[in-house]
């Protein structure tokens, strides 16, 4: 089920990112200190009054080299295209500016809810100055101090009031997957080839989300799939649409709704920073992953080429050691028949549940191989572990002191669990918790 999207827009230096961090709070988390996992905070999940939503700081997407007004226009266009609710941030210290008026004229035409936030209202006396912002024609201004957290609750209330009705839960038996990657890596050709390979009638499912084109199909064994594609990857006519920074947001929307991600790399161009950035988002979201090297037919190859590629991918995507790699050609259909089976296998791994007794046998065996660490004379004690979730498989390890569970030992336990059970293509999460 797609989460509704909130876009934060506004000219530079009005405090968009501060408001973003204040709303997102601790939900922005970097779970691993691994090189290559993105530290970009333009996208997060927020929650208020039991409603979850996606939050986008459009300033983080912007092209800093573009002319000033072009940047602002770009932000507003993204907001118009993507958001269910737009949060327009202005500065109470500077008052209404020409740039604010420029953005307001664009937003006024969107026919989408716009919440006008006057930020940097850091003392009560400044509240008297917010009335000038009524001139923007966007309704009541909300005075806020993002730095001090004053007024953000009122903004969140307004966001929730303007969100669309919640969608019905999707069928959990249907495997949802998407192809993501840089523009021109061959996603569209792969999509068409996969659908053709299945020899089924594929039908677009309209209205599932505002901007997605979902294609539903069934394989010969009766497994149902939903392939999530975005309108932005297919439609034309917008100058910014094919820029990598715009496609980042499209990819993140697809990642959010998918169970399994097919990360497509162009064999002709190799691995780029964009690939690592998007893969990091999918990894942190706990999604299943297949690394698909497309256009494999275009390369001059010898007996070592595939191994060299695999080594390079493992080196540059160290945090994706669990993800299988497949070399394909959408043009010649090389190895495409393997993809649906790989997706099914990963979905099965994502939904695996390990009985507590079996899991704890593995944990005890791991401790026998590599005793728990000590810190300042105090040894980590592991009492027991249990699985608390699937998609991704998540385990809580109950210990005497959480601080004694070093990252390296947590990684060791994860590796031992992976050796004992089949978790192909899916991350697994381990959480240390003090036993009460």
Swiss-Prot record:
Matches recorded under CDD domains: EngA1, EngA2
Residues binding GTP 1, per UniProt: 10-17, 57-61, 119-122
Keywords for this protein: GTP-binding, Nucleotide-binding, Repeat, Ribosome biogenesis
GO molecular function, one term: ribosome binding
Domain EngA-type G: 4-167, 175-351
Gene Ontology biological-process annotations: ribosome biogenesis
Every KH-like domain range: 352-436
Residues that coordinate or bind GTP 2: 181-188, 229-233, 294-297
Keyword Protease belongs to the record: no
Family statement drawn from the similarity comment of this UniProt entry: Belongs to the TRAFAC class TrmE-Era-EngA-EngB-Septin-like GTPase superfamily. EngA (Der) GTPase family.
Assembly information from the UniProt record: Associates with the 50S ribosomal subunit.
HAMAP family associated with the record: GTPase_Der
Role, per record: GTPase that plays an essential role in the late steps of ribosome biogenesis.
Protein name: GTPase Der
Species the sequence originates in: Streptococcus suis (strain 05ZYH33)
